[in-house]
Amino acid sequence: MDIRAAEISAILKDQIKNFGQEAEVSEVGQVLSVGDGIARVYGLDNVQAGEMVEFPGGIRGMALNLEADNVGVVIFGSDRDIKEGDTVKRTGAIVDVPVGPELLGRVVDALGNPIDGKGPINAKQRARVDVKAPGIIPRKSVHEPMSTGLKAIDALIPVGRGQRELVIGDRQTGKTAIILDTILNQKAIHDNGPEGDKLYCVYVAIGQKRSTVAQFVKVLEERGALQYSIIVAATASDPAPMQYLAPFAGCAMGEYFRDNGKHALIGYDDLSKQAVAYRQMSLLLRRPPGREAYPGDVFYLHSRLLERAAKLSDERGAGSLTALPVIETQGNDVSAFIPTNVISITDGQIFLETDLFYQGIRPAVNVGLSVSRVGSSAQIKAMKQVAGSIKGELAQYREMAAFAQFGSDLDAATQRLLNRGARLTELLKQPQFSPLKTEEQVAVIFAGVNGYLDKLPVSDVGKFEHGLLSYLRSEGKAVLDTIRTEKAISDDTKAKLKGAIDSFAKSFA
């Protein structure tokens, strides 16, 4: 048998030539124990707080507790396939998500993975979920209105671009409906408004039923509002770490628009469930519990999230991120731990009441307890002119109505006040999915505060409003256009508006 050494060495050299020389070095650790979505890992000595780690099978986790002899890792996914002794790898990256316009119209989970079955998202940029909020110098005071399309809010509790306005109330009082209507109200601007006025919307669903989220997405899709919205969903069946992370992920997506000179709105629905998820994680990580068993830094959890909503200065592109966090109360108790925390962080609250809801006053806004700490600087001049008196009149009405229950012989002035108040309360009612443009709201409230409703039966106020709007949209279009462009009611506009309402009132009678 003839062995040719030269030929064998040539073959070996040829084989070795294509052999990859780079060896991947990664720091690894071992799972000591796992359960309830928490893994204790030995090793990983140089891991950073908040760093992503990888378990076998591609499951991700985040290092939260860095202790002397082990690392506490929360698992983003099911811990069923992770067992003691498994190898855990560092990724070297702090938790980040895809951001950018490519996400518009999509439904994603807390890590930015699509869950709507519409294929992958080819985002060109990624951003860390937990970044520092802008400081004092890069900010500017809130001065542009963020129109919700709801009369009760835009007239009495105005929200500005860059503000944080809390929506608080018991379950089933219409909290989500306010956010939904606000998102739907942006459609008109997106269809034919200038780019600088467009408001991109992010909706974060935390711990909700999947059917509820699906319904929300369906409404947006049917009404053409999904194209400018991003939905981040961490539903009730998702692990607690995902529910904790979802608001931060949504915020990072909203910040992309804020930092690029655009305007965005983010609704967190709701932060009570995020606090519960964070409490669960903290207790399992054996962090010491505080009031109501929440960890000591639950205030910081919400403050660092909500401080990221801001109106940036002109040097920074004048973008904004407006936040509408939702908090669910138990039995109208606003003095519980989480509600008081979030009330103190935000720039005002819209307080919804079960009693008002069942009386048919919807949106069920308690005007007395609701405030906006930005106030009239977030309104156009026309709205300030008409809505200035309505808040005072309603406050007097509520006070008088309480006394009027006891006495029957009321003087004429009190009677007039009660009549006007009842009609204004009726005027502020609004069905769902029917947001109004600002100039239409101005016209309707103008009719209310100038006594056009005083002679009508309360039951006809809604009909009068509906008819007046139809009339103005067809016959009085010029007046509405003037209010929209001038953003104020001059004496000339006032006379024209009065004339239009007078001519409609004659035909209505």
From Swiss-Prot:
Membrane topology term reads: Peripheral membrane protein
Which PANTHER family does UniProt cross-reference here? ATP SYNTHASE SUBUNIT ALPHA, MITOCHONDRIAL
The record's subcellular locations are:
Cell inner membrane
Name the gene that codes for it.
Answer: atpA
Pfam families attached here?
A: ATP-synt_ab (PF00006), ATP-synt_ab_C (PF00306), ATP-synt_ab_N (PF02874)
Reactions catalysed, as given in the entry: ATP + H2O + 4 H(+)(in) = ADP + phosphate + 5 H(+)(out)
- What name is this protein filed under? ATP synthase subunit alpha
Assembly and partners are described as: F-type ATPases have 2 components, CF(1) - the catalytic core - and CF(0) - the membrane proton channel. CF(1) has five subunits: alpha(3), beta(3), gamma(1), delta(1), epsilon(1). CF(0) has three main subunits: a(1), b(2) and c(9-12). The alpha and beta chains form an alternating ring which encloses part of the gamma chain. CF(1) is attached to CF(0) by a central stalk formed by the gamma and epsilon chains, while a peripheral stalk is formed by the delta and b chains.
- UniProt keyword annotations, A-Z: ATP synthesis, ATP-binding, Cell inner membrane, Cell membrane, CF(1), Hydrogen ion transport, Ion transport, Membrane, Nucleotide-binding, Translocase, Transport
Q: Which family does it belong to?
A: Belongs to the ATPase alpha/beta chains family.
This entry carries the following GO cellular component terms, namely: plasma membrane; proton-transporting ATP synthase complex
Q: Has keyword Nucleotide-binding?
A: yes
- Described purpose of this protein according to its UniProt entry: Produces ATP from ADP in the presence of a proton gradient across the membrane. The alpha chain is a regulatory subunit.
The record's principal subcellular location, in a coarse class, is membrane
Molecular function terms, GO-annotated: ADP binding; ATP binding; proton-transporting ATP synthase activity, rotational mechanism
Q: Known Gene3D superfamilies for this protein?
A: 2.40.30.20, ATP synthase alpha/beta chain, C-terminal domain, P-loop containing nucleotide triphosphate hydrolases
User: Species name for this entry?
Assistant: Rhizobium meliloti (strain 1021)
Q: Where, in this chain's numbering, is ATP bound? A: 169-176
Give EC number(s), comma-separated.
Answer: 7.1.2.2
Which residues does this entry assign to the site Required for activity?
370
